[in-house]
Amino acid sequence: MITTVQEISKWRNLCFIRMQSRKWYPVLKKTPLVADGRKIIKHADKVPHPEEIIHPFYQPTAIEQFTACATEYNPSLLDGKKIAPSLIKHPVSLKTILVDSKLKFDDIRGVNKWLMEFVARRQHQRNIVLTPASKSVRSFHVLHLSSTDIAKLRGLENILSEIENTNDLQSRVESVNNELQNIFDRDSKQTRLFCENILAYLIKNYGNSTEKLILLINVTEMQLYSRLDQMKAMNIILYNILCKVEANENPPYSPTLVTALENLLAAINNRFFPGRCENSLHPIVIEQLLSYFIKTGNLNESKNFLGHLIKKGILPEATIINRYLEAIDVHFDKSTKIFDIRSKFAFIADLAPIIENYGTIDLFKFLIPMCRHFDELCSLLNIIRKSNNAKRAVDSTLPIFIKKVLTFTKDPMINSGNLSTVFNIVSPIYGQNVPSEFVEKFILSFALQGNYTMMAHMIDTYKIKLSHKYQLQIIRALKNSERNHALKNTGAVGYNKEFKKYFIEKYLNCTEREALRP
């Protein structure tokens, strides 16, 4: 029994939580808490609230929901495995952390309510309507400068013409800033010239080199606390700067240019907002910034701007989304490690409405390797099945789905059942006439499971021609099955020696039969 203050202090010191930060989100390192020789249940084992789950496409089917509601003890989704990416509060620091959670309940109480909230949230994401940003640049048109106005800018043009490198940029920035002030001092009463129009004109006509563009970005930053006092003006300037960045350079961008532009964005935030300025930026400018940060490999900012576009009901261009996914793959080196998949989910959590309603083939191909449970794979396949380009998407992704099915378990009977489920989901898309090239892939996958019954059924139903080459592929798959599942299911219907003998005699030529003889 613990009786003294010292003993209590000693006991408390046995309990500890360590934090580890990597990549984007801080992550809870799940070190067991020890007290009185017993392990305390880890906080991450609690079923998260539906709002805390960031999985962008998993949707439990009606059967999964019924099973969870009808199971009295430890009902679960996804077999109760720790694969549901969630943002939860750390139990001690109260900071938001990224963890893989179990969707495993202690008992049946509250499961139905939890499911209703989770499904309602998914339905809300499904109902979000996104529209492409208007490509009208009318908002960014600058006031036409007359020849008289342009003549007033001659001093600025002369300074810009003399710049050759970045070594003397600071002094040139001061010179341009002073000349700007002189222009406004000389013409303060009747001028129609505004600072944003002058800078936009200079960026458009003289920002063709990195050095001059950096100078004009720095001048813009200096003018933030004098004549650039509205976000409308900053939209005009940022639009022209980002157009020039896009036109002038291919990634990787000059580090000096990247620093100058990001310093300007930080200064805009400090000048106009306590936090971030996205709410007052034009959607076209936000999309430009998204594209820019993707190209610079800044995934954190890319995610911020992408999420903001979606929240504003804007559908980013498909090419931008594809580049974002490529940047994620590059950052994580197409890793399938548990931690990296969890982190990748954090970067695509905002894409739920796009996956549901505007998914592209490239997006679906990106998502398939991220599935860690067959039910996730089925959720994704059902989204594709309901999409407007279902047939074209299935044509491009079905071989990847078939291959992925066999990665969740080594049990041949479970794999066979999962293969049959996938086949039943996609076959209506083809009006039950599944192309023979896909049927053949299913047959080979069933061969890898040693399932002679399903192989024979599909060969007969779809009248598959067994060429010499294809028979050899089947034989190799069956041999692999015998090696991998030598002690499993040998007596099960469809897998036993009688079915093997029947299949060999009916479907394989004499020369091929010998290869499978004991």
Swiss-Prot record:
Q: Which keywords does this Swiss-Prot/TrEMBL entry list?
A: Mitochondrion, Transit peptide, Translation regulation
Q: Which GO terms describe its biological process?
A: regulation of translation
Q: Does the keyword Transmembrane apply?
A: no
Q: Where is the transit peptide?
A: 1-19
Is Signal included in the keywords of this UniProt record? Answer: no
Where's it mainly located?
mitochondrion
Highest taxon, organism lineage: Eukaryota
GO CC term, one of those recorded:
mitochondrion
Give the Gene Ontology MF terms in alphabetical order: translation regulator activity
- What is the annotated role of this protein in its UniProt record? Required for translation of the mitochondrial OLI1 transcript encoding subunit 9 of mitochondrial ATP synthase.
Q: What else is known?
A: Present with 504 molecules/cell in log phase SD medium.
Name it.
ATPase expression protein 1, mitochondrial
